[in-house]
Regions:
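The feature marks the mature, well-folded catalytic cores of soluble enzymes
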Residues: 1-135
Length: 135
């Protein structure tokens, strides 16, 4: 499996990208550049891999990009067609960068911002659905 980076990385951060890619190549670490992203932070909008290996894609409409929608990548529309991954989709608004699994994968930490960004969900229902999705 290759590490994936946004194809924007070499354009926006050429020196850092060159250092990173040279280092990866020197250690025979495969990597790929992903076309169609609108920002370099793939972790925020790509699917989250659960402890069992299932991929879950959340709606990515973070409050911090409310006034800058050009930076918001819609995984389902912009990237999923070219990747063909088996993904479970959720309408929960969640920045994947706010999802951190414990080393065992048995527990997950999520920023409490998930509650303010999903006002249509009662808190208990949101926690329950996240527990089901993230196993």
């Amino acid at each position: 499996m290759a590490f994936c980076f946004s194809a924007l990385l070499p354009t926006l951060y050429p020196t850092d990208a060159e250092t990173l890619f040279t280092t990866l190549a020197a250690h025979d670490v495969p990597y790929a550049l992903l076309e169609g992203t609108r920002d370099v932070w793939l972790r925020d909008f790509m699917p989250v891999r659960t402890g069992s290996g299932k991929l879950v894609s959340f709606r990515y409409e973070p409050c911090y990009l409310k006034n800058d929608p050009v930076l918001r990548t819609d995984f389902r529309k912009d990237l999923a067609p070219q990747l063909g991954l088996p993904v479970t989709y959720s309408n929960i608004n969640l920045d994947g960068g706010n999802v951190v699994f414990s080393p065992s994968g048995a527990h997950v930490l999520i920023s409490d911002r998930v509650f303010s960004e999903n006002p249509e969900y009662p808190s208990a229902a949101l926690v329950h659905e996240l527990s089901e999705l993230l196993e």
